[in-house]
From Swiss-Prot:
Record domain IF rod: where: 84-394
Start and end residues of each stretch annotated as Tail: 391-544
Region feature Disordered, mapped onto this chain: 450-544
Compositional bias (Basic and acidic residues): 451-462, 526-544
Entry protein name: Neurofilament light polypeptide
Cell location: Cell projection, Axon; Cytoplasm, Cytoskeleton
Region of interest: Head: 2-87
Family of this protein: Belongs to the intermediate filament family.
Source species of the chain: Xenopus laevis (African clawed frog)
InterPro entries associated with the record: IF_conserved, IF_rod_dom, Intermed_filament_DNA-bd, Intermediate_filament
Region annotation Linker 1: where it falls in the sequence: 120-132
């Protein structure tokens, strides 16, 4: 006869065919409050041990059992089986939750490692920021030097233009002085021309007076001559009348000749003086006219040059004003650019400080997360140890119950963890003698790990400069602690297996008092583990 048993913990859900014999399952109403997991290996070994023990030790006693006892046992076995399934499903769900929690923590750890890598890259980036800042400063300095060079060039140009302006002003002053001299000479020439004109008018008047005098003298001479002629005629008549009168004609002719010579001489001298004076006045007038014309030409040329120089001066003034405005604009622009660059420098420095503070905050958060991770790893290791100890205890107690529980002829199958007469699993379960010491060792390890984590948290409050080194060292220490924890767990498992093999026979012979004492010890160990877990959770909440 074969029956199908369903194992829900295989990866592909399978049904196995097991040769069934009259098996007696063990009743237990205990529901473990501790966090345990189901191991397929333990399940298969327990089932095999149940099969072998039932096939070897229960076959002779089947004939002596009543059908009512068999029915009661089968109903009890069904109840125990359903309870076991419920417990195993609960443990499986809890184990799956633990695995999901571990995966979630691993994902968070990866995310935190990526963030740490980014933060380290950002921490290494200030050199590039410094290069960018120095490049920007160099560009600003080059621009400032170029602006200073342009400013110096403009200043030199301004000085050159100022020198040219001073030269032009000097020439303008010289031209003004020469103009004043020319105007003064022109005034003198005008005065001389006026004097020459007055002298000419005077000479003309004098010439008119002399001509009138000559005419008057001619008239007087003619009258005298006529008188003399009349007198001569009268004298001749009288002489003729008076027969012996003197001859006056020769004397008159002599006087007339003398007067004519004197008149001709005076006329010639007057004409010569008039001609010489007229020539002198004509030459002086012509000379003054040439001087006036030259002065007028020079004055017009001076006026033209003065207007040209005035235009040049105005142009130079406009250029000077434009250059001054350009210099002022360049100075304003440079001051604005320098202020902008200074603002950019201040902004970059502020960003650098913010980045450093943010990086320190990220490092602090990463340190806290590392501490939380280490605490969670410690808690997981503690739970793992508790689960492994529970599985070991269950396996050993199951084996001891099967080997030593059915030695009596009565339906009472011995005092084991799955005794049919036990009403509560908490009061009648039998533990190995070494399990209490094993739990105490685990509690000591947990306390040592907690102390080490506290010490590391105290070290985490070092200055910001040592945070990276401390984080790396703690990361390495965490890995070494995990490796040591795994090695210690493996060693403890090996020791547990060896001690379990040696003490399998002793477990069946232990009394009810020892089982209760060991149960109390296990309860104390579990309570200590729960207290340690609660302390860790409180620490996590405080840190958060």
């Amino acid at each position: 006869m074969s029956s199908y048993s369903y194992d829900p913990y295989y990866t592909p859900y399978k049904r196995r065919v097991v040769e069934s014999s009259p098996r007696v399952h063990i009743r237990s109403s205990y529901v473990s409050p501790s966090r345990t997991t189901y191991s397929p290996l333990v399940s298969t070994t327990m089932r095999r041990s149940y099969a072998t023990s039932s096939s070897s030790s229960f076959l002779p006693s089947v004939d002596t059992m009543d059908l009512s006892q068999v029915a009661a046992i089968s109903s009890d076995l069904k109840i125990v089986r359903t309870q076991e399934k419920v417990q195993l499903q609960d443990l499986n769900d809890r184990f799956a939750n633990f695995i999901e929690r571990v995966h979630e923590l691993e994902q968070r750890n990866k995310v935190l490692e990526a963030e740490l890598l980014l933060l380290r890259q950002k921490h290494n980036e200030p050199s590039r920021l410094r290069d960018m800042y120095e490049k920007e400063v160099r560009d600003v300095r080059l621009a400032q030097e170029e602006a200073s060079g342009d400013r110096q060039t403009l200043r030199n140009e301004r000085e050159r233009l100022e020198d040219a302006l001073r030269v032009l002003q000097g020439r303008y002053e010289e031209e003004a002085m020469s103009r004043e001299d020319s105007e003064a000479r022109l005034l003198d020439v005008r005065k001389e021309a006026d004097m020459a004109a007055l002298a000419r008018v005077e000479l003309e008047k004098r010439m008119d007076s002399l001509l009138d005098e000559i005419a008057f003298l001619k008239k007087v001479h003619e009258e005298e001559l006529s008188q003399l002629q009349s007198q001569v005629q009268y004298a001749q008549v009288s002489l003729e009348v008076e027969v012996a009168k003197p001859d006056l004609s020769s004397a008159l002719r002599d006087i007339r000749g003398q007067y004519e010579k004197l008149a001709a001489k005076n006329m010639q001298s007057a004409e010569e003086w008039f001609k010489s004076r007229f020539t002198v006045l004509t030459q002086s007038a012509a000379r003054n006219t040439d001087a006036v014309r030259a002065a007028k030409d020079e004055m017009s040329e001076s006026r033209r040059m003065l207007s040209a120089k005035g235009l040049e001066i105005e142009a130079c003034r406009g250029v000077n004003e434009a250059l001054q405005r350009q210099i002022q604009e360049l100075e304003d622009k440079q001051s604005g650019e320098i202020a902008g660059m200074q603002d950019a420098i201040n902004k970059l420095e502020e960003e650098l400080r913010n980045t450093k503070s943010e990086m320190a905050r990220y490092l602090k958060e990463y340190q806290d997360l590392l501490n939380v991770k280490m605490a969670l790893d410690i808690e997981i290791a503690a739970y793992r140890k508790l689960l492994e100890g529970e599985e070991t205890r269950l396996s050993f107690s199951g084996v001891g119950a099967i080997t030593s529980g059915y030695t009596q002829s009565a339906p009472v199958f011995g005092r084991s963890a799955y005794s049919l007469q036990s009403s509560s699993y908490m009061t009648s379960r039998a533990f190995p003698t070494y399990y209490s010491s094993h739990v105490q060792e685990e509690q000591l390890d947990i306390e040592e790990t907690i102390e080490s984590s506290r010490a590391e948290e105290a070290k985490a409050e070092a200055p910001e400069e040592e945070e990276e080194e401390a984080a790396e060292e703690e990361g390495e220490g965490g890995e070494e602690a995990e490796e040591e924890g795994e090695e210690g767990e493996e060693a403890k498992e090996e020791e547990a297996e060896e001690e379990g093999g040696q003490e399998k026979e002793e477990e069946g012979e232990e009394g009810e008092g020892e089982a209760e004492a060991e149960g109390d010890g296990e309860e104390e160990g579990e309570s200590k583990g729960d207290e340690a877990a609660e302390e860790e959770s409180e620490k996590k909440e405080k840190k958060k």
